[in-house]
Amino acid sequence: MTTIASLVLAYLLGSVPFAVLVSLGMGLADPRSYGSGNPGATNVLRSGNKLAALLTLLGDAAKGWLAVWLAQTYGASFGLAAPEIAMVGLAVFIGHLWPVFLAFRGGKGVATALGVLLAVNPWLALIAAAVWLAVALLTRYSSLAAMVSAVATAVAAWFIEPGVYAGLTIVIALLLVRRHKQNILNLVSGTESRIGGKKKS
């Protein structure tokens, strides 16, 4: 029962739509109404408000980190071990992808995944961020950077955090890449928008 309750709470935390809340709180348009329509930091950046994008990024990452940190810190008292904590990390990530508060139409999960990784092992988060930054600087494609980063981090997890956390990282990477299906098609067709640019038609 404790495990189920933890997963439900993690999912609900992951469902909190910071992109929408921050945008509406700052008097901006709902990010689902422009650009890619994705409720995430990259799309919020297309509004031209860098602070809103940063706050969205921090909020989405924080909820991923908080869910896992709480499970790590207090879970042992309720019988939660590494497998259950990994499930909590997956639950908060899934909450962001398919949030109950947005009719199950959420974001791509990049920032939330980073937050989960930060709680699991800061080195994994550092690798993810470094790879994302390198690819983004070279190509200016946020989507490509996210996918390459996810795959690279999943590989690194086998050496840094073998076991259930490596499994968690791989599942997150698979889901994240799957959420970028349209971006992959856009990259192939040459219509994918670049960081700092307008969405191509």
Curated annotation (Swiss-Prot):
One of its GO terms (biological process) is phospholipid biosynthetic process. GO terms for cellular component: plasma membrane. Pfam families: G3P_acyltransf. SMART domains: G3P_acyltransf. It is found in: Cell inner membrane. InterPro entries: G3P_acylTferase_PlsY (IPR003811). The chain crosses the membrane at residues 4-24, 84-104, 116-136, 157-177. Its EC number is 2.3.1.275. It catalyses: an acyl phosphate + sn-glycerol 3-phosphate = a 1-acyl-sn-glycero-3-phosphate + phosphate. It is an enzyme of class 2 (transferase). The keyword S-adenosyl-L-methionine does not apply. Pathway: Lipid metabolism; phospholipid metabolism. Keywords: Cell inner membrane, Cell membrane, Lipid biosynthesis, Lipid metabolism, Membrane, Phospholipid biosynthesis, Phospholipid metabolism, Transferase, Transmembrane, Transmembrane helix. Probably interacts with PlsX. This is Glycerol-3-phosphate acyltransferase.
